[in-house]
A protein has these predicted regions:
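Short, ordered, surface-exposed loop/turn motifs in non-cytosolic proteins
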Residues: 191-193, 200-217
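Iron-sulfur cluster-binding cysteine motifs and their immediate structural context
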Residues: 16-34, 72-99, 106-123, 140-161
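Short, acidic Ser/Thr/Gly-rich low-complexity loop/linker segments typical of extracellular
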Residues: 217-231
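Structured interaction patches on ligand/partner-binding surfaces of diverse proteins
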Residues: 249-271
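Long, compositionally biased charged/polar accessory segments in the mid-to-C-terminal portions
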Residues: 144-191
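A short, solvent-exposed beta-strand micro-motif common in secreted/extracellular proteins
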Residues: 230, 238-249
Length: 271
């Protein structure tokens, strides 16, 4: 069966995937796979923009949010009409049959990922279909994947993605294994701590200062040196409490930092 993979590190936020999805499904009736997607209010694939940090250290990451086409789909379990939601054996795509859906909304409420929408005008639930109608006509991949210029988003056989899946991350990691999600990510945004060290007396940045970041409880320690601009940065940090220590010769400074959010410490005087 097929899986979707997305490498956040090479996604440039072009929105081609989101636009291609709209182009394929708005005003187009692909019954029995899907009725038309509304112009507004629904994004069967929504590109999430994650902005974090504080000026001047701001990072932006993009990743698609779509149906996970779960092997143990909560929506299928919640559906009250036999066969209205089914999983295709040949590719693993989960489909809401628009000819059988009665509009009870049970699947909308059951989806823990918030990716099933309700079409008030048509009185039916709708979501990503993986462009199953195109695959059935000979396409190798959905429109969103076909439109991705950086190959960040792929639709491949599960066996081909074994190495990717082994290191994969998930938007809801606590549910991924239980639901058997078939959308796998790598390099999802994590916390960072950054700053610029300077000497207030010399009025110059401090180059080559030793910067150590110690997790509370001594679980892990990270180290770095300030660069030619006096900058340092620690990336891919877990959420937690840390002690940041900066040393240069006899001068030192200690700062308590929490990664409940990304932290840009700005200019740090070393005295």
């Amino acid at each position: 069966m097929k899986v979707f993979t997305h490498d956040v590190s090479i996604c440039n936020g072009c929105y081609n995937c989101q636009i291609a999805c709209k182009d394929e499904h708005v005003a187009n009736d692909w019954t029995p796979i899907a009725k038309p997607q509304p112009d507004t209010g629904q994004f069967w694939l929504k590109l999430s923009e994650n902005v974090r940090g504080q000026v001047p250290r701001v990072k932006i990451a993009y990743y698609p949010v779509m149906c996970n086409h779960c092997d143990n789909a909560p929506c299928m379990e919640a559906c009250k009409v036999k066969g209205a939601i089914y999983k295709r054996k040949k590719d693993g795509l989960v489909i809401i049959d628009p000819t059988k859906c009665t509009g009870c909304r049970s699947c909308v409420d059951a989806c823990p990922y918030g990716v099933i929408y309700f079409n008030e005008d048509l009185n039916l639930a709708q979501k990503c279909t993986g462009c199953a109608h195109l695959l059935d006509s000979g396409w190798k991949e959905p429109r969103c994947v076909d439109a991705c210029p950086t190959l960040a988003l792929k639709f491949v056989e599960e066996s081909e993605a074994k190495d990717f899946i082994a290191k994969a991350e998930y938007l809801k990691p606590e549910r991924a294994a239980k639901d058997g999600v078939r959308v796998h990510y790598q390099n999802l945004p994590k916390r960072f701590i950054a700053g610029t060290v300077y000497d207030p007396v010399e009025k110059e940045v401090v180059i080559g200062a030793s910067v150590t970041l110690a997790a509370k409880g001594g679980k892990k320690t990270y180290s770095a040196k300030t660069d030619g601009f006096g900058d340092f940065e620690f990336e891919k940090l877990p959420v937690g409490q840390f002690t940041l220590t900066i040393k240069d010769g006899k001068k030192s400074k200690e700062i308590k930092v929490s990664t409940d959010k990304d932290v840009s410490l700005g200019d740090i005087p070393l005295t």
